[in-house]
Regions:
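Bacterial N-terminal signal peptides that target proteins for export
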Residues: 1-10
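A short gly/proline-enriched turn/hairpin at secondary-structure junctions
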Residues: 64-77
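Short, low-complexity N-terminal intrinsically disordered segments enriched in polar/charged residues
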Residues: 5, 19-52, 56, 60
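Hydrophobic h-region of N-terminal signal peptides that target proteins for export
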Residues: 12-20
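Short beta-strand edge/turn micro-motifs at domain boundaries
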Residues: 126-153
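Surface-exposed, charged secondary-structure patches
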Residues: 76-125
Length: 153
């Protein structure tokens, strides 16, 4: 393959990639900030015991949390499911610890569904959350929160 053909292939590939990225961004870009805000409403609501923020983040009608837990009697791992309405109630008071969160990835599909990967750190535990959201009539709401937690030494 000569240099001109190689350059043409490279330019065509770059143009295709740039066009695909630009198109995808314009389709979901207007919703990106709303999805980010919903994820941080959850995080800030939990950290600050702010039920109003949690209500803005969670779909209390259909939402659930799934988590790995260990059965105290058998010692076996199990998957526990808790309605988001109940889960929100766990955060009635602000934490005295410093919590931090970083969004690792956002995937938005047709401005109707989104998934956010959230790196969530507290002094005692490190979490990775996957937040699945639907855009409802009242905005973006978390309908499924799945996470793993690792206790720190």
């Amino acid at each position: 393959m000569n240099k001109i053909t190689l350059l043409s292939v490279a330019v065509a590939a770059f143009t295709f990639l740039f066009t695909a990225t630009s198109s995808a961004g314009s389709v979901t870009g207007k919703e990106y900030q709303a999805v980010i805000d919903t994820a941080y409403n959850y995080f800030n609501g939990a950290a600050n015991g702010d039920q109003k923020l949690l209500l803005e983040a969670f779909d209390l009608e259909f939402g659930h949390v799934k988590m790995i837990s260990v059965n105290k009697e058998t010692g076996k791992e199990t998957i526990r499911t808790v309605p988001l309405k109940e889960f929100a109630g766990y955060f009635k008071k602000a934490t005295k610890d410093t919590w931090s969160a970083n969004i690792l990835s956002v995937d938005i599909v047709d401005d109707k569904m989104a998934m956010v990967k959230l790196d969530f750190d507290t002094p005692k535990t490190h979490y990775i959350d996957y937040l699945v959201m639907y855009k409802r009539e009242n905005g973006w709401r978390i309908i499924n929160k799945t996470f793993v937690a690792k206790k720190k030494q």
